[in-house]
């Protein structure tokens, strides 16, 4: 927690526990066998099929199918961690470059702000005003952490010998992130932006009931000069991948926002 708060610079924290949001139910629509619309994950800078070959539908509040997302599994998590570890040169990039890319992400997201807001409203049932505010805050978070990229500076301390001690803040490394169910776009952006700002790479499992905001971000990542492997998104049922992610020995940290039951699992395995 100390490391997470240092990154996000949280000021006002709620004591209210997060509650699980169950995925909405509906009637799946038949697919067109003549068109390949296989849902993809985002690993290593590319849209890739889930290893399982399976997908699951996402429904709106009124039971209408909005789309399909790939059902990631343990192998997809492993591939995503490998891709993130292969992109550790991100930590050696200049703070100015990281800031530029975060600004670029914010600018590209702002171009599609109305589209993202409509998608969030349809998925979650929020009214248009709330969804537009969520997108607006997401863009502001990207700009905020772009500004912080060159301000995670070190400090000079006195030493009991003739000389000084220079303390430098360094990236944690590869961070596994399991996003909260609510606020599907803002929750994801609020977690990856500070991690990227400091030079970390990420393996992200987005909101389980509302993952389409994350899959819509694939194109934003692809057009924002983000190096391959820096952000990897694996859509999945949280309960099916949480052990694989939090227990992975090649991760340096795990950030989890969700139910207290799964929180205990994450803490035990990590």
Regions found by a protein language model. Give the residues of each.
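N-terminal glycine-rich, Lys/His-bearing helix-loop that initiates the first secondary-structure elements
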Residues: 12-65
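Conserved NAD(P)+-binding/catalytic subdomain of aldehyde/semialdehyde dehydrogenases
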Residues: 1-3, 169-178, 224-270
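A generic structural motif
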Residues: 50, 54-55, 70-73, 209
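Short beta->alpha linker loops
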Residues: 72, 123, 133-137, 208-212, ...
